Amino acid sequence: MKLSLDWMNDFTPLKEVGLDVILKKIAVSVCEIDGVVPFRPELDFVKIVRIESLDKHPSADKLQIAEVFDGSSKSQIVTGATNVKVGDLVPLAIPGAKLGDREILESELRGVKSSGMFCSEKELSLSEESSGVWILNGIEGAEIGKTIRSFLYYEDIIFEIDNKSITHRPDLWSHFGFARELASQLRLPITFNPFESLWNFDLSMKLPRVLENQNAHSYYASSICEVFVIPSKRKFQSRLQKCGIRVINNVVDVSNYVMLEMGQPTHFFDKRFLESQGGVSLEVSYAKKGESFALLDETSPSLEEEILLIRNQGRPVAVAGVMGGKESAVQNNTTEIVMESAVFAREKIRKSIRSTGIRSDSSVRYEKGLEATTTLPVIRRALNLLKENGCPSLKASEPVGFLHTPHKEVRIHTDIHFINTKLGITLSQGDITDILERLHFMVSWKGDRLEALVPKFRHNYDVTIPEDLVEEIGRTRGYDTIQVTPLLAEIKTPIRNLSRELERKCKTFFSVGLGYHEVYNYSFQALKENELDGDVELSVKIRNEMPEEQSVLRNSLISSLLKNIRTNQDRFSEIKIFEFGRAYFNIPEPDNEKKFFSFAVSFDRKSSESDLGLLEDDFLKVRKEIESFLKYIRIFEYFWDIKPEIFFHPGASLSLIVDSKQIGNLGYVHPAVLDSFELKKRVIYGSLEFEKLVEIWNTNRNISRFNVPSQFPEAEIDISILIGEKENTNLFTDLVRREKIPELQEGWVYSQFAGGSVPVGKRSVSYRFRLVNYEKTFTQERIKEISDHLVALAGKNGFVLR
């Protein structure tokens, strides 16, 4: 938005204050400024001169030599203009002037010195076309020696305001509103208030008809006669041009002028056109779907039912608050008009803008939310401006219309302690009263309690709560005057989130230590995928309509991880992934939602792989990884139990048991499941219930398991036995552990073999047991004694030695 300093000076003496002071106060207390520029400063080098004489050029038939007078001296100009004569007042660009890309220099034309150039309106960028030098004879204000910039009222400073910084301040979208704000901030008086304009309405004139409804906050119309449509006076033209508004004629220009001055849009209808429709009967109503009529911008959009229209005798003549109709617009021969001044709900104007795609200067102001009581004062001001701008004898009927909330008030209650606490400084009641009254609030105190009546131009959406008052006081006093002090806050040890802490440990160990990659999946999946793990009847269905493959919440993570492997099986030979995720069940809380830590591994073994040795090695490798993870999170007492699962191969399905509770599982995914997911390779899948894992870890995390290393050499005993093809290898290690051999530190399976000389249905399993003595070196006799004990234990329990 562009604001003219000269225009704002009509309302308060801003020119008496230094420009630097104004700019600093705007930046600190009002809004952001994109730029401050003088308007058309190049026209200071173009003066009005009078042609004293004209002579033919001695060496060029189409050139003339003119002697001109600028009020203090004479100079010689060579010109090719044919429309000038002695005595004419014309604009002269003197040497040093820059007009567009052209710089005027003192030069010689065919041997004759020329000290400048006569200018046309086009050369001065005042018109798109011109027929010759601009002749200024008889034009008001055209005086010899005056600069064109002064003649055109262009001697001005333009403030370019950042619109987004005043979106919440509709009162600042006008010259008077901004001047009023600056007057408050700089302690300047208001010398003229356009909202206090007076006008004597002609009570004998026929009144227009306005149908009252709830489609506008306020709507008034007045009939105006003895109107003459002519070009606007220079003052009006220049002020509109400085704000980037196109000049049209004196009537339309006044409508734009009053909008820029007071922030309230108005509209003029050609009364003769309205009467041709059967009389003047205006109404605010909604469009009919598909309705269309020509607008001022030559478009005819198809309208939606949510768009507000102005109708006359039921026919559309304007899109309310956005743009007028072409047929009802003021014409060059218009002598009577109907003036409209209205305020519409901002949300309705926003819908019209969105639907039509039209964003006008009027709609920009309406969408911010205007104060409804301004409609009548704006009519009075516009009538005064029309009279000043070429319609000296106009008459106007008394405005007719409605105002729904004439006595709306917003009162805010707070106390001095609240204000000072929020600002972080100590202000007295006098300080607060001074600031608020300068901002046009009405203030009253009862002890430390404050009541502030918000001015009408601020109470719609801007200032409504005590915090808004604090902001007004703070910005007016100046945020730069508030001393920066460090915040005082109690330092507390943060509460440990054990679940989050263990989750980070798990992710770090699996990704950094074991080379797994973390994956993220949606919780939506197909109902048939929930059949893999659990009761499908407990599936949680998604209420809003979804595709069949995303119709329920998952009850385990196996389907998600298998789909991840399917996506990547042709890209990588080995896939190791894990996911932290939730599973959902249609049962009462808190068991309706569980968090799982699940993982899946594919070692590039085809689903038809029949080499049991390779498959068992892969499985033992993954199991060893999980056991190292359990040790990492301080879970030392556990065992693996054979437990069939429908999604696991019956020969490779284990449950992890800790403290007699199952906390997870591990196994080869069943070939039928692999086929259903179109998987070409064997997959090992495992899952741990995370809440149970957290509980066990929390119990064990402070227990020290450190053992002082023995100073004596360790010993190892290997033993190989035959066990059933489907028997758990833990059976023998559990038997050994229960014997409580003092020197026995640990035991594990280090190899397995099936086929060859091994009987059918059996497999050869080799165990290794580590022996540690803290008191003396092992003797061969003691090692043999323990070895014989293990052999006897195996035979006693039906195991055959290899």
Swiss-Prot record:
Required cofactor names: Mg(2+)
Chain ranges of the B5 domain: 407-484
Keyword line: Aminoacyl-tRNA synthetase, ATP-binding, Cytoplasm, Ligase, Magnesium, Metal-binding, Nucleotide-binding, Protein biosynthesis, RNA-binding, tRNA-binding
Main location: cytoplasm
Catalytic activity annotation: tRNA(Phe) + L-phenylalanine + ATP = L-phenylalanyl-tRNA(Phe) + AMP + diphosphate + H(+)
InterPro entries per record: aa-tRNA-synth_II/BPL/LPL (IPR045864), B3/B4_tRNA-bd (IPR005146), DNA-bd_dom_put_sf (IPR009061), Fdx_antiC-bd (IPR005121), Fdx_antiC-bd_sf (IPR036690), NA-bd_OB-fold (IPR012340), Phe-tRNA-ligase_IIc_bsu (IPR045060), Phe-tRNA-ligase_IIc_bsu_bact (IPR004532)
Pfam families, alphabetized: B3_4, B5, FDX-ACB, tRNA_bind, tRNA_synthFbeta
SUPFAM superfamilies noted in UniProt: Anticodon-binding domain of PheRS, Class II aaRS and biotin synthetases, Nucleic acid-binding proteins, PheT/TilS domain, Putative DNA-binding domain
tRNA-binding in keyword set: yes
Note describing how the cofactor binds: Binds 2 magnesium ions per tetramer.
Enzyme category, top tier: ligase
Gene3D superfamilies recorded: 3.30.56.10, Bira Bifunctional Protein, Domain 2, Ferrodoxin-fold anticodon-binding domain, Nucleic acid-binding proteins, Phenylalanyl-trna Synthetase, Chain B, domain 3
GO molecular function: ATP binding; magnesium ion binding; phenylalanine-tRNA ligase activity; tRNA binding
CDD domains: PheRS_beta_core, tRNA_bind_bactPheRS
Protein family (similarity comment): Belongs to the phenylalanyl-tRNA synthetase beta subunit family. Type 1 subfamily.
Protein name: Phenylalanine--tRNA ligase beta subunit
Organism listed in the record: Leptospira borgpetersenii serovar Hardjo-bovis (strain L550)
Name of the gene encoding the protein in the UniProt record: pheT
